[in-house]
Amino acid sequence: MEIILLNKVANLGGLGDNVTVKSGYARNFLFPQGQAVPATKANVEKFEARRAELEAKIAEQLAAAEARAAKVAELAEVTIASPAGDEGKLFGSVGTRDIALAITAAGVEIAKSEVKLPTGTLRETGEFEIDLQLHSEVTATIKLVIIQEA
């Protein structure tokens, strides 16, 4: 099925690209999320008329993500206090939700889906480098310190 992408889609293309995808992927995922439209003659003409508006919107989202990345870079570190045993093993774990809440409390709005933990939840005290995927093109790193709760 021929479609026109309305924004950047991983492993497919960018704004305005005419691509061929399986019809189920288009109907069940891309169309409902507003990421694509069928490549009919009428839709191609409509898209060309709105291209500048869509490009400006994408540039605005990218600029906002870069501004948030700069704010994250200004934060030296974020500290989370969690109950732990004598050897530094946590009673429970620190996950993406906890990290997002701690960064938001420090002054930078972060969603839990933007926090990337490739090794899973953190289960011990110490210092960790946490990657944040703020936009498809913008990533940031923040230092997270987990301390034993008094």
From Swiss-Prot:
Under the heading Pfam families, the entry gives: Ribosomal_L9_C, Ribosomal_L9_N
UniProt entry tagged with the keyword Metal-binding: no
What would be an example GO MF term here? rRNA binding
- Name the keywords, alphabetized: Ribonucleoprotein, Ribosomal protein, RNA-binding, rRNA-binding
List, alphabetically, the GO terms of the cellular component aspect: ribonucleoprotein complex; ribosome
Family in the record: Belongs to the bacterial ribosomal protein bL9 family.
Record's PANTHER family? 50S RIBOSOMAL PROTEIN L9
HAMAP family from the entry? Answer: Ribosomal_bL9
Q: What does this protein do?
A: Binds to the 23S rRNA.
Q: What is the protein named?
A: Large ribosomal subunit protein bL9
What is the organism of origin for this protein? Pseudoalteromonas atlantica (strain T6c / ATCC BAA-1087)
